[in-house]
Amino acid sequence: MFFKNDSDRGKNAPERGIVPLLPLRDIIVFPHMVSQLFVGRERSIAALDEAMNRGKEIFLAAQRNAKTNDPTPDDIFGVGSVGAIMQLLRLPDGTVKVLIEGKRRARIRRYVQSDAYFLIEYDEIVESSVASVEVEALMRSVQSTFEMYVKLNKKIQPEVLMAVQAIDEASRLADTIIANLPTIKLTDRQALLEMEEPQKRLERLIELMQAEIEILQVEKKIRSRVKKQMEKTQKEYYLNEQMQAIQKELGGGERDEFKNEIQEIEEALKTKRMSKEAAAKVKKELKKLKMMHPTSAEATVVRNYIDWILELPWYDKSEERYDLVEAERILDEDHYGLKKIKERILEYLAVQALTKKLKGPVLCFVGPPGVGKTSLAKSIARATGRKFVRLSLGGVRDEAEIRGHRRTYIGALPGKLIQSLKKVGTNNPVFLLDEVDKMSTDFRGDPAAALLEVLDPEQNHTFNDHYLDLDYDLSDVMFITTANTLSGIPVPLQDRMEVIQLSGYTEFEKLNIAVKYLVPRQRKECGLEDVSLDFTEGALRTIIHHYTKESGVRSLEREIASVCRKVARRVVSDGKEKPIEVVAKSIPKYLGVPKYRLGRREERDEVGLVNGLAVTNVGGDLLPAEATVVPGKGKLVITGLLEKGMEESGHAAMSYVRSRLDRLGLEADVYQKVDVHIHFPDFVRKDGPSAGVTMVTALVSSLMKVPVRRDLAMTGEITLRGRVMPIGGLKEKLLAAHRGGIATVILPKENRKDLRDVPRRVLKALRLVLVEHVDDVLREALILPDAYAIFGPPKGVLEYRDGELVTEAAPVKAPPAAAGEPTPAAPPGA
């Protein structure tokens, strides 16, 4: 029943009426929308009954909160739609099924009654219906957008799209579309219902549909991806089932083999002794492996990982020997000389025998090539009953070589440490890290940093390899490292090691090594054990002097091997086994022309030529220094492939000489009239300050035009005050002097403590003069009649003859001068 006041409104004036209200939960009925509702609340059923009595019209409005069972006027939106009941059916359970069609928008004016049911008075909302090109374009855009939505949302029937495309009224188009968008939120639907202008309603509708389209497109992609994955999984399952059926027909095949492998792993896990962490890891990986297909790539990775853990020697040890007498016998049997080194090794083994632990410094053998560093490590392994394993670090630049690759990488493996321990089969071998000074660094990491943990006794019991990702105990491993020089080893790594220097062998030691070890070994390797072959001492000396230039004996063995091969050929060709003696004069026939000129002293005393001493990569050597003076303007030139340190030493020598011109009897401005050139022959890089006294002597000899003794060599750093400072490598330098035929060696007094490292045979063959000042060097070296008058008597000079200390330094008669050369005078009072 409608109450209309026609006198108050015109033709298009809004209607007003009083009708029952039906509160709706989670649904909004739009005009032109037919909805089927199930009504169960008593007040709502009463409202329907009243509507049937009032001409079947009812007001439909949504609740603000769907969970409210007994709403009040404040719980109901103020805008809804007036609808007509098309059909009403009472169900057996008391529920009423009703079919209602929305007719027009309306706003609640007031509540007339709210007791048994809601009775309200409403005002109709009159919509503007202005037709324009803009509205027409907007309608087309809405229809096009809805078409896209329908294509993505398969729940909407195609007939709905056809009906929407036939609508030519903006308001009805908007209401029809919103009625068919079930995913739009209730608040957005209510807002569209309250919009009076169709144009704004269409614009908002486009925004909502575009947002829904984006969501539907993402859902479509997800469904497509899931579908493909399911199809792939189903396909794999189907193929696997087929494969299993085929294998079953053929007698089990791969699956049975896979089961056998798992059983073997389970049995090995029961018997293998390993850490609790490792056992738990194997069980976890085995559980994963059982769920995998045998031929999958992941199964192969897991199997390899389990194999590595099971094959490592977690608690497998070699039986160790602590017999020092036997250890000393083995060291003496394998190596000649090296007395100090052997004593240190025996001390190391004695401490281990008492403590039964390896905690202590790691030994680092430093020395030139071929002196026996690697073979010493092998002898230690033999003496202690441990197995021996060697890892060369030369050229290693990747941290993963030490720590391994993580399992995420294809083809990942443990580091070389773990690989070597698996190969050797015990967890207490003698582990030689060879050429530790030859490692380098790049973008993949610093292997030297990775070794810090390995060589630290406080940390290596929990060494963690990246591949295993487990703690492995390295504390029982006896690590030994080798290097040619300390310069290539980082300081933190040096701090974890005890450095043992292995100097070069003397000529006497090389002779004995050749006779006792090298010649017998090469005779055996060349099949000459039954042939009477003898190397004379002269032949071996010739090979040492003219065919090798090294501190060790590696090249010496190669040359002996070359002689033995030529002898073997001669024996096979002649078919006779006559005694063969290799003598000095026959060596060029076997080895060709001499390769090296022995670093020996000159045959004449010459001006500006001084024998210096140096340490090279192959041991000690004579380092002759030449100085010459030419007319010029005081320029100093130093040549000979020198490093910066040696050039600075040359400038210091020149400054000292200039400060002593008056004492030397030279004009004060003589250096301004001449250029001085100091040269060090031989194309070998030279560095260090130990040639300071050599350059001072060469400069003074050239400026004074006084010759230097040819049978004398010297070494020492100088200061601007003329003090002679200590140097390094004394043993190697004295070996070189002895080898080069030098009779007297001048060296810093502060190096007296280092003489204990020099072989007794060498000390007895040399006269040693230990000085503190350059004046003592010049007095001893220059062949000068009035040397004592110029440089004064010796002060604090020590002299060794035949290896014994002489209380006072006595003058030594210089070697006979060549024809036409001055003869040195005896000192005053002699």
Curated annotation (Swiss-Prot):
It holds the Pfam family Lon_lid. It catalyses: Hydrolysis of proteins in presence of ATP. CDD domains: RecA-like_Lon. Coiled coil: none annotated. InterPro entries: AAA+_ATPase, ATPase_AAA_core, Lon_bac, Lon_bac/euk-typ, Lon_lid, Lon_proteolytic, Lon_Prtase, Lon_prtase_N. The active site is at 690, 733. Its EC number is 3.4.21.53. Induction: By heat shock. Its main location: cytoplasm. Residues 811-830 are annotated as: Disordered. One of its GO terms (biological process) is protein quality control for misfolded or incompletely synthesized proteins. It is found in: Cytoplasm. GO terms for molecular function: ATP binding; ATP hydrolysis activity; ATP-dependent peptidase activity; sequence-specific DNA binding; serine-type endopeptidase activity. Keywords: ATP-binding, Cytoplasm, Hydrolase, Nucleotide-binding, Protease, Serine protease, Stress response. Residues 604-784 form the Lon proteolytic domain. Residues 811-823 have a biased composition (Low complexity). Gene3D superfamilies: 1.10.8.60, 1.20.5.5270, 1.20.58.1480, 3.30.230.10, LON domain-like, P-loop containing nucleotide triphosphate hydrolases. ATP binds at residues 367-374. Residues 19-213 form the Lon N-terminal domain. One of its GO terms (cellular component) is cytoplasm. Belongs to the peptidase S16 family. ATP-dependent serine protease that mediates the selective degradation of mutant and abnormal proteins as well as certain short-lived regulatory proteins. Required for cellular homeostasis and for survival from DNA damage and developmental changes induced by stress. Degrades polypeptides processively to yield small peptide fragments that are 5 to 10 amino acids long. Binds to DNA in a double-stranded, site-specific manner. HAMAP family: lon_bact. Homohexamer. Organized in a ring with a central cavity. This is Lon protease 3. The gene is lon3.
